[in-house]
């Protein structure tokens, strides 16, 4: 399942937040001179809309356009379920109980470029263009009924592994998207609510992966003595929602090494379990065979073994594999802390760290701003 699962599950979460800039309402007695200069100043740029009016009300606006470049590293745990697999364009087997994923971890290294502009004094709009190198590691097993026994006249069984495997996939991806950031600042304190939508193209997927990211932030900017120079600190959250359905088709040659041997071993174990469950049933008395719980346990175990055996038998003759599955982040939210140093109103450098919630990420970036 090297690409059936892993290439499909690796969602590209390298789309970081924009540099932390905002329209700041100047307040306080120490800022009286700055307020006076803002109230009479002519705003020289086309954007944002209402820029001159807001400036005269005492807001210090950032330059209206900019471009930023960011490097993003991220590691995230994934959950996979509702797996269906078919072979040679045949019928799909529902294998959610049969194939179980133990660990699925996606690691991404990416660079994104973001051009942006302020449409209104409190609304920033930006585009996203990104490239990434990705790696997904998954451990999984094929399970079937086993450990058959009779306890007080009742048939019992447990799920047991008939095949264990793990693999790592590596691939490149390209993303495009757009975002909006409503934000407000008063006296150096600020709130920002970053939202973006991206479409990520992975050659092995039938359709692009769609991702929505929401990142609320709350912070404070501290001014230095040098004009226009400051440092901002913030905390916040990072929420990821992605389209969960994934489907595609792959050649068996792209599967894990030793696939044929693993399938053959799995078939032998399933055949052995089928013999055991029949012996288990035959050991019951006629009265015990009429118990509803025994009938249910016997028919259920036979059905599950039948599905596992049919899937493995089809896999042993397969040249291609078709699949459907659902995947999602183990946790949608994680916590973030960040900082930005503004050298002047043109140049900023920032860093942000995300952790907790089964996701760890690091973002570093450089931004250049200009009037438009």
Language-model segments: residues:
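Short loop/turn motifs that connect adjacent beta-strands in outer-membrane beta-barrel proteins
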Residues: 21-24, 54-65, 117-122, 184-191, ...
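Transmembrane beta-strands of outer-membrane beta-barrel proteins
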Residues: 65-70, 125-127, 189-195, 214, ...
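Residues on the lipid-exposed face of transmembrane beta-strands in outer-membrane beta-barrel proteins
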Residues: 69, 113-119, 127, 178-184, ...
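Transmembrane beta-strands of outer-membrane beta-barrel pores
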Residues: 71-77, 129-135, 184-188, 195-203, ...
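Outer-membrane beta-barrel translocator domains and adjoining extracellular loop/strand segments
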Residues: 79-86, 137-144, 202-209, 245-252, ...
């Amino acid at each position: 399942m090297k690409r059936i699962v892993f290439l499909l599950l690796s969602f590209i979460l390298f789309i970081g937040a924009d540099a932390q800039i905002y329209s700041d309402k100047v307040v306080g007695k120490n800022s009286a001179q700055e307020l006076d200069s803002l109230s009479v100043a002519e705003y020289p740029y086309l954007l944002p809309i209402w820029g001159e009016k807001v400036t005269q009300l005492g807001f210090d606006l950032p330059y209206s356009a900019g471009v930023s470049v960011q490097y993003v590293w991220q590691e995230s745990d994934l959950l996979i379920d509702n797996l269906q697999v078919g072979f040679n364009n045949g019928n799909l087997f529902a294998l959610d109980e049969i194939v179980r994923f133990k660990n699925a971890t996606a690691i991404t290294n990416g660079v994104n470029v973001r051009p942006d502009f302020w449409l209104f004094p409190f609304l920033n709009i930006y585009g996203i263009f990104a490239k990434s190198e990705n790696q997904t590691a998954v451990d999984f097993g094929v399970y079937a009924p086993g450990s058959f026994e009779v306890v007080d006249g009742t048939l019992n069984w447990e799920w047991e592994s008939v095949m264990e495997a793990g693999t790592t996939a590596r691939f490149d991806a390209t993303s495009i998207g757009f975002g909006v950031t409503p934000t407000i600042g008063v006296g150096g304190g600020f709130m920002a609510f970053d939202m973006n939508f991206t479409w990520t193209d992975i050659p092995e997927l039938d359709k692009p992966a769609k991702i929505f990211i929401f990142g609320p932030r709350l912070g404070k900017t501290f001014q230095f003595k040098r004009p226009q120079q400051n440092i901002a600190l913030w905390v916040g959250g990072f929420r990821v929602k992605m389209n969960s359905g994934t489907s595609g088709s792959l050649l068996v040659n792209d599967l894990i090494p030793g696939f044929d041997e693993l399938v053959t071993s799995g078939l032998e174990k399933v055949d052995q379990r089928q013999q055991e469950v029949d012996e288990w049933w035959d050991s019951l008395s006629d009265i015990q065979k009429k118990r509803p719980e025994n009938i249910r346990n016997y028919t259920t175990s036979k059905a599950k073994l039948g599905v596992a055996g049919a899937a493995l038998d089809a896999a042993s003759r397969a040249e291609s594999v078709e699949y459907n599955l659902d995947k999602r982040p183990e946790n949608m939210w994680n916590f973030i802390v960040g900082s930005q140093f503004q050298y002047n109103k043109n140049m900023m450098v920032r860093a942000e760290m995300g952790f907790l919630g089964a996701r760890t990420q690091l973002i570093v970036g450089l931004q250049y701003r200009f009037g438009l």
